[in-house]
UniProtKB/Swiss-Prot annotation:
Disulfide bonds join 35-49, 42-55, 46-82, 48-65, 57-63. Belongs to the neurotoxin 03 (Tx2) family. 05 subfamily. Expressed by the venom gland. This is Delta-ctenitoxin-Pn1a. Residues 1-16 form the signal peptide. Negative results: does not affect the currents in rat brain Nav1.2/SCN2A or skeletal muscle Nav1.4/SCN4A sodium channels. It comes from Phoneutria nigriventer. The keyword Signal applies.
């Protein structure tokens, strides 16, 4: 009886892991591929990952993703526009 339960558990685990692999193949593009991390090049706030980062073009010649100084303003703005 115990052997049958272990066998069925392994069978269910095998089917579950197969299902997860199929889902990964359906959606190959991850969130990290669509947005930039800190210090990544950007053109607008939506190019930066997370709600606390913004595209900063003010202090440097090239625009880069930086932590926002005013998160209370940046987070709702990114939720509405991105």
């Amino acid at each position: 009886m115990k052997v049958a339960i272990v066998f069925l558990s392994l069978l269910v685990l095998a089917f579950a892991s197969e299902s997860i692999e199929e889902n990964r193949e359906e959606f190959p593009v991850e969130e990290s591929a669509r947005c930039g991390d800190i210090n990544a090049a950007c053109k607008e706030d939506c190019d930066c990952c997370g709600y606390t980062t913004a595209c900063d073009c003010y202090w440097s010649k090239s625009c880069k993703c930086r932590e926002a100084a005013i998160v209370i303003y940046t987070a709702p703005k990114k939720k509405l526009t991105c």
